[in-house]
Amino acid sequence: VTKVLNLMEGDWYDADGNRVLEIGGGYINGCRVLAAYDFAGASSHGAGRFEILESTGTRNLYLQWDIRHADTDSIKLNDHQMLHRTAKPPFNESIAGIHLGMTAAEVTAVLGTPPQVLDLSPYVNTHGWYYPDLRIAVTFDADTVDRILLLKGSRAILERSGLNCENAPYEFAQAYQMKHVPHVRYDDSNVFTGCHAIGGEEYLSFGNRMECVMLSKYWN
């Protein structure tokens, strides 16, 4: 417990700049941590319940943390609120003005209310907001963007590199200085071919026949 609390030590803010969590010295928001249980995952990327002693009694907080000692470190509070060490964590790449870590409200401000909410399989096994005119989809972890899918035929691009599904895999390797050219399958297998780091704890993966390029915070 001490190890995990030390890992998360510091102040954690919501997207509006409000300090939501203050962790340090065995305390959360000035309340002593009495116990922790239901741990899952590893020390740097995991989840657990923390029982704290408030003036009115005990309370449980469910925390999921992703600590890579980077500006994008995050804690998800009670499954619905994403917190960072700064109100506006930096981002590396964007698509149609949308980047990882944006809130749902910020996405709506840029792209408008999503016309559709779709099951995004086979690209990813979750539902997401779909903008058919742009041919892009956005998924969320709690209240922040965790994936942006750029589909074939979209006029949108990865705004740092200028690339999209019309480009060849080797062009992505050159633009993002990847260690090797991404492997793209040209069959109906839908086998996942891996993620490719592009810096800033962001990753790209590629669908069959370059039907989709996905920008994600996940490395697997």
Give a label for each model feature.
Residues 1, 76-93, 212-220:
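Edge beta-strand at a domain terminus
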Residues 1-11, 24, 97-100:
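N-terminal helix-cap/turn-to-beta initiation motif at the start of protein domains
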Residues 5, 15-49, 144, 148-167:
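Mature extracytoplasmic domains of secretory-pathway proteins
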Residues 6-11, 26-27, 44-52, 72-74, ...:
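Short, hydrophobic/aromatic-rich segments at coil-to-beta transitions
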Residues 13, 104-150, 163-220:
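A cross-family detector of function-defining hotspots
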Residues 14, 28-31, 52, 73-77, ...:
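Short hydrophobic/aromatic-rich beta-strand segments that constitute the beta-sheet cores
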Residues 18-21, 31-81, 174-181:
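Contiguous, well-ordered beta-strand patches that form the walls/edges
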Residues 91-97, 125, 155-161:
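Short, recurring structural edge motifs at helix starts
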